[in-house]
From Swiss-Prot:
Region of interest (Catalytic), residue spans: 86-517
Localization in the cell: Membrane
Residue span of region Stem region: 45-85
Miscellaneous note of the record: Present with 2890 molecules/cell in log phase SD medium.
Record topological domains on the Lumenal side: 45-517
PANTHER family per UniProt: ALPHA-1,2 MANNOSYLTRANSFERASE KTR1 (PTHR31121), MANNOSYLTRANSFERASE KTR5-RELATED (PTHR31121:SF2)
Name the record gives this protein: Probable mannosyltransferase KTR7
Species the sequence originates in: Saccharomyces cerevisiae (strain ATCC 204508 / S288c)
Gene (UniProt): KTR7
Amino acid sequence: MAIRLNPKVRRFLLDKCRQKRYGFLFLGCIFAILYCMGTWPFFAKDIVHDPNNLPYSLQDYSTDKDEPFFRGCTDTKLYLQNPAYSKMNASFVMLTRNEEIEDVLKTMRSIEGHFNKWFKYPYVFLNDDPFTDHFKDQIQAATNATVEFGTVDEIMWEFPAKVRNSLQFKASLEDQNDRGIMYGNMESYHKMCRFYSGIFYKHPLVSKYEWYWRIEPDVDFFCDISYDPFFEMAKHNKKYGFTVLITELYWTVPNLFRTTKSFIKKTAGLKENLGTLWKLFTFNYNILDTDDEEISRWVNFPWDAKPKLTEKLMVDFLLENHGQVNNEEDLEGIQYLVERARSKVPMLEDSLEGEDYNLCHFWSNFEIARVDLFDNEIYNAYFKFLEESGGFWTERWGDAPIHSIGLGMTLDLEDVHYFRDIGYRHSSLQHCPKNALQSQENLNTFDEGYNFGCGCRCVCPKKGEDIEDHSTPCMDIFFELLHGREYEKEFPGCYKPSIKDKDVIEEIRRENFRVIE
């Protein structure tokens, strides 16, 4: 069953106008929005739109590239007894502090009740200070699984001495605070982001495992997880799993993509071997297949092509007639010519080689992944390159966009799994799936089941929005890659133009034959 995509282009464009430093005038953005409303179907005609505008949470997204491992509950007892099943070399990982004990216990009660009471995977707790006996006793009393406590040493946790003792370091944090960057003045937050970006997987308590499941203090799980996510990931050749896909705040990472592109350029063979997951995190401005370099400079979005090529045809027609004005269409040609003379070429300040970071990222507060996704030559070199650039303190680079972009360089879309069936809340963001339509115990206790549902004994919050329906444009892009025409098995490190100028010109000719004949 194909998902019916909901285009949210108008809202997305307004967000881009606010977040990005494009050299477009506001009226230009409004024009693009209005034009897009009328022309989007021409450029996205392969996509099936839902006439009822159903939210994603009421649809089935499954394709041969990704789908829930199970729809609804499986018999956990029989699952564990299956000879084909084997427990994986995996653990939970949490970075926390002694004073967060109550929030840690809240998370543990939730994950134990919904999953680990059956599977008993070990926990690894890390802290930049030693854990107290009180903390350890409370944690060990909350589970029958193995628990390990580790300290993050100074080399792993602290910025190099020459950095943290410099005036520039302190000035950078103060500047971020003055500009209202979220957590920008919190040195500990910068350290945490740096640690999770490229160091946590080297800690001896983590590196001995093949898989990890990152959890945080103060987390709620809303559904039972009646199967082993680690085992199913391995069985289905998945390497990274997520529940939330959202956009980053632009001013926390203004130079992250520029630095990443520099790394790609300096790493032999990397550009030619970028994974197809790269397309989930980047905008493509190489839209139009044309030999006209002047036109290509003006066309950066699908909705740019038709008006710019119409303008070109109008002007060409007028010039061929030596500027004679014989009718209303000729007058339009003159108006186009005047507008072109007055206009400036659109300036995309963050565009690099026709690409830009779209700010989408997997929310790394929840991630289930192979440890060697990060502990490998390419990713380690990437982290080192980022570290040397100083962005972890001159800006407020988060581990989530770094993980995502790093994985985009090496993984294909099929390597990633969306844990849609796992209900999850952390901070103000939450996702909770619809229950599957199947026999469930105590039906009055759990939410109603649906034929498109996949959750197992879910009890979703009555308040709050599901991030799946409101993460624009990230979920739109993800589902389109799973279903739409944009997906390419072979991705030679760069985008191919998706629109041929000849096709657009032919469309214009059919609509406006009097103007150009």
